[in-house]
Amino acid sequence: MSTNLHWQSFGQGPDLVLLHGWGMNGAVWQQTVESLQPYFRVHVVDLPGYGHSAESHAEDLAKIADLVLQDAPEKAVWLGWSLGGLVATHIALNAPQRVSKLITVASSPKFAAERPWRGIQPNVLTAFTDQLLEDFSVTIERFMALQAMGSPSARKDVKQLKQAVLSRPQPNPDSLLVGLNILADVDLRDALTSLSMPMLRLYGRLDGLVPIKVASDLNEQLPSTQQFVFNQSSHAPFMTEHEAFCLQVREFAA
C-alpha cells in the first residue's frame, strides 16, 4: 500500500493547495488551475484512494490529513471542496502552522442533518453506502447528478465532473466507503471556534448537499470569518460560476 500521494504543482507565487471532494480527483480543478496559476503556486493532490493515489488508503479523516501533509508545502492557503473542506479544516485545526488561510467550498463542518442542523438526510447517506457496495460507478454517477442538481448549467457541470473522474484511475471502493462514513459521522462545529487563521466560506445558493442555511448558522458561530454565496450555483460553484469563484479566491488568498 503506497503512502505517497499524487501531487501536481503549477504557476508561481504564494502556495495554494486545492483538495477535491468525494468520488472525484484532482482533475476537477483543471479550469481553476488555469485561471489561478498566474497568481499562485497551485498544488493539486489526489486524496488517498482517488485518481492517481488510488493505491493509497486512509481509514479516517485524521489519517487522510496526515498523508496529505506529508508532501504538502510547508505553509499555504488551503482550499477544500465538499469532503475536501473537512480535510482542509481538520488540517487547519490540528496543524495550524501549515495553514496561512483557509477556504472551504460547498462544505460543512457536519454534512449529516441532525435537527435543527441542516444537511444531507442520514437515510440518503445510508442508501449511497448500500449502493456503493453493489456498484460504485453507478453511485458516483448519482452523486454527480445530485451535486449539479438545481444549477442552470447542471448538464454541463455533470459532464465536466464525469470527464475529470474518468480521466484518472477509478477510486478505491474502500476509500469511497471511508469518505461516506466521514460525511455521515464527522462533526467539527464546536472545534471551528478555535480556528486561528482567516477563513472564507463559499457556498452555492442552490446546493442540495450543503443547504444555504448552513452559511447563516455559521455566520452567527464564526463572526470573524468571511462568506460568499454564488446565486446561480449548486454544489460546484468553481465550475458553474468559474470567473466569480476565481475572483473570490484571488481577493481572499492574496
Curated annotation (Swiss-Prot):
Top-level taxon in the UniProt lineage: Bacteria
Recorded metabolic or biological pathway in which this protein acts: Cofactor biosynthesis; biotin biosynthesis
Catalytic activities: 6-carboxyhexanoyl-[ACP] methyl ester + H2O = 6-carboxyhexanoyl-[ACP] + methanol + H(+)
This protein's UniProt keywords: Biotin biosynthesis, Cytoplasm, Hydrolase, Serine esterase
Annotated binding of substrate, by residue: W22, S82, L83, F143, M144, A145, L146, Q147, H235
Every AB hydrolase-1 domain range: 16-241
Active site: S82 (nucleophile), D207, H235
Gene Ontology CC annotations of this record: cytoplasm; membrane
Localization annotation: Cytoplasm
A molecular-function term among this protein's GO annotations: pimelyl-[acyl-carrier protein] methyl ester esterase activity
Record-linked Pfam families: Abhydrolase_1 (PF00561)
EC annotation from Swiss-Prot or TrEMBL: 3.1.1.85
GO terms classed as biological process: biotin biosynthetic process
SUPFAM superfamilies given in the database record: alpha/beta-Hydrolases
InterPro entries: AB_hydrolase_1 (IPR000073), AB_hydrolase_fold (IPR029058), AB_hydrolase_sf (IPR050266), BioH (IPR010076)
Entry similarity comment: Belongs to the AB hydrolase superfamily. Carboxylesterase BioH family.
Function: The physiological role of BioH is to remove the methyl group introduced by BioC when the pimeloyl moiety is complete. It allows to synthesize pimeloyl-ACP via the fatty acid synthetic pathway through the hydrolysis of the ester bonds of pimeloyl-ACP esters.
Oligomer and partners: Monomer.
Name used for this protein in its record: Pimeloyl-[acyl-carrier protein] methyl ester esterase
